[in-house]
Every structure is written in structure tokens, then in C-alpha cells.
């Protein structure tokens, strides 16, 4: 097993161990396809895509595991809970943006999420995408018979 784990780039001072998982090309390909690392996306589209995923998968736990799961309004209360959590997450993104970027750092490349303007676009895309996908999940769960909640 010691032959598989070695220092990253044969430099023991980096502080990262290269394992077969962390240094494989498959892992790199999967990580490069995530919207946070994909090349050529604007901050708005990054936030939109990340928000779409989060809004959609946050709906299920609130509907199936929420305190009103056995009532007639389980779906609607799960939707409202999801929107509430999305608001809290967006507030957290806002606080991080104010703390990290403060006032007016401007650079020529606005696609790197390291400026206030780019972070605000990311945050807006996240909010719109998450609320939209939570609404889409609500429509799917309420109208498609295969997805009905019992």
C-alpha cells in the first residue's frame, strides 16, 4: 500500500498526498466538468447551474422528512421550506461576498469569481436557479402521477 501513496509531484513539502483516487485522470475529468471549474462559463451561468442542482435536490428531504410530511400540505410546506433555505444560503453568499471582496476591486477578467461584480452575478444566478428548480420540482411532484407523494 505504501507504493500507491506518495507525495504530490514528488515534493514532500506540498502537504498533499497523491493517492490513486486524487491523482487519477478520471477524477480530474469529473472535477473539470463541475460548473465551479468548467472553463468558459460566466459567473451568472455558474450560479444558475449550481442553483438549479441545489434547489431541485433540497426539495425532497423537506417534503419526505419535514414535520408536515403526513399532512395534505406536505408538498407546499416542503416547497416553502426549500425557498427559506435558499434565501438563507443566498444571504450567506452575500455576507461572504461583502467580507471577501468589500468595495471596488476591479480586474479585467470578470469570469474568475474574484471580484464583487462577478460574485454578485454568481449569487443572483444561484438564487434564480435554485428557486426555479424548486418550483419545477413542485410542479413535477404535484402533477406527474409517477412522482406523487404517498
From Swiss-Prot:
Database matches in InterPro entries: PSI_PsaL, PSI_PsaL_sf, PSI_suXI
Compartmental location: Plastid, Chloroplast thylakoid membrane
Signal sequence region: none
GO cellular component, one term: chloroplast thylakoid membrane
Keyword terms of this UniProt record: Chloroplast, Membrane, Photosynthesis, Photosystem I, Plastid, Thylakoid, Transmembrane, Transmembrane helix
One Pfam family linked to the record: PsaL
Record GO biological process: photosynthesis
Stromal compartment spans: 1-72, 145-150
Membrane-crossing residue ranges in chain numbering: 73-93, 124-144
Record's bilayer topology term: Multi-pass membrane protein
Membrane-side (Lumenal) residue stretches: 94-123
Disulfide bonds: none
UniProt-recorded name of the protein: Photosystem I reaction center subunit XI
Originating organism: Trieres chinensis (Marine centric diatom)
Amino acid at each position: 500500500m505504501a507504493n500507491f501513496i506518495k507525495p504530490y509531484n514528488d515534493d514532500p513539502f506540498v502537504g498533499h498526498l497523491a493517492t490513486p483516487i486524487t491523482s487519477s485522470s478520471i477524477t480530474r475529468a469529473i472535477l473539470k466538468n463541475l460548473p465551479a471549474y468548467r472553463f468558459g462559463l460566466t459567473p451568472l451561468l455558474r450560479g444558475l447551474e449550481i442553483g438549479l442542482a441545489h434547489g431541485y435536490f433540497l426539495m425532497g428531504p423537506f417534503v419526505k422528512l419535514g414535520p408536515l410530511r403526513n399532512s395534505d400540505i406536505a408538498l407546499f410546506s416542503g416547497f416553502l421550506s426549500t425557498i427559506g433555505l435558499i434565501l438563507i444560503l443566498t444571504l450567506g453568499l452575500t455576507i461572504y461576498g461583502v467580507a471577501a471582496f468589500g468595495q471596488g476591486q476591479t480586474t479585467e477578467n470578470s469570469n474568475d469569481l474574484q471580484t464583487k461584480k462577478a460574485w454578485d452575478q454568481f449569487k443572483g444566478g444561484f438564487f434564480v436557479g435554485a428557486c426555479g428548480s424548486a418550483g419545477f420540482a413542485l410542479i413535477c411532484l404535484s402533477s406527474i402521477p409517477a412522482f406523487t407523494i404517498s
